[in-house]
Regions:
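Short His-Asn-centered micro-motif
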Residues: 26-27, 131, 178-179
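Catalytic core of Fe(II)/2-oxoglutarate
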Residues: 125, 134-136, 144-219
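A short coil-to-beta-strand element that immediately follows conserved catalytic motifs
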Residues: 97-116
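Active-site rim elements
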Residues: 67-86, 125-129, 162-164, 185-189
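Acidic carboxylate-rich catalytic motifs and surrounding loops in phosphoryl-/glycosyl-chemistry enzymes
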Residues: 112-119, 184-190
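Non-heme Fe(II)/2-oxoglutarate
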Residues: 2-5, 10-99
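Conserved short histidine dyad/triad with adjacent acidic residue
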Residues: 117-133
């Protein structure tokens, strides 16, 4: 099962502690599964030619990423819903194990997995330095395409001078962490002329307003 493969990668990877607890590993998915996902993503036709905009903390207008949820995969000819289901189910079933690797983590009784493909604009796109939303417990980002780009940057504080390291962009590599308030500062951006596409999986408090795989589905 693909879900078991993903969990094995997560639980067999050591925690790195600088600048805060996180994991980073390659070969997240088996070669054939990743090839299938990448080909689907490279052929995505974006329906909304004009991206939405929002204002970041500095007051600068930046493009809003387009998020494609499993329920909408068929609209974009993405044939990967069964695989995402397997991974999300495994994350829920192993929630305590995944989080228990970390020194500190949040917890909620009503859990869900928010799974989606994120399409962020080409350069000069940049998502400002931020911390994870308080509703998120465990965050995983798998790099899909293009071949070269900028990964996730980590900081000790919410300013550029506090930059410590980058989870390097490499297709089929994954960056994971458990959000801690006022600590897990990070940002991401694009330095290429093509969309930056990732697979995002968030273990978090369930919300009816969001797209979730819910714990009760598997009980």
């Amino acid at each position: 099962m693909l879900g078991d493969y993903f969990i094995d990668k997560c639980t067999s990877t050591a925690i790195e502690n600088a600048p805060w607890a996180h994991q980073y590993f390659a070969d997240t998915l088996p070669e054939d599964s990743f090839k299938k996902l990448r080909e689907c993503c490279e052929n995505i036709k974006i329906k909304n030619a004009e991206p939405k905009f929002y204002t970041d903390v500095s007051g600068t207008y930046i493009s809003c990423p387009i998020l494609i949820y499993p329920k909408d995969f068929k609209d974009y000819n993405i044939d990967f819903e069964d695989e995402i289901y397997s991974i999300a189910k495994a994350i829920l079933e192993n929630a305590r194990v995944l989080c228990g690797q970390y020194p500190r983590y949040r917890w909620f009784q009503n859990l869900g997995v928010n799974a989606h493909i994120s399409i962020t604009p080409p350069l000069p796109y940049k998502f400002y330095i931020h911390q994870e939303g308080l509703e998120k417990i465990w965050s995983s980002v798998t790099y899909i395409t293009p071949e070269k780009n900028i990964g996730t940057k980590m900081y000790k504080a919410q300013n550029e001078k506090a930059f410590i390291k980058e989870a390097i962009w490499k297709p089929n590599s994954t960056f994971i962490f458990c959000g801690e308030q006022n600590k897990t500062w990070h940002s991401y951006e694009s330095n290429q002329a093509t969309n930056r596409i990732t697979l995002n999986l968030f273990l978090m408090k369930h919300s009816k307003q969001r797209n979730f795989y819910q714990r009760h589905l598997y009980q």
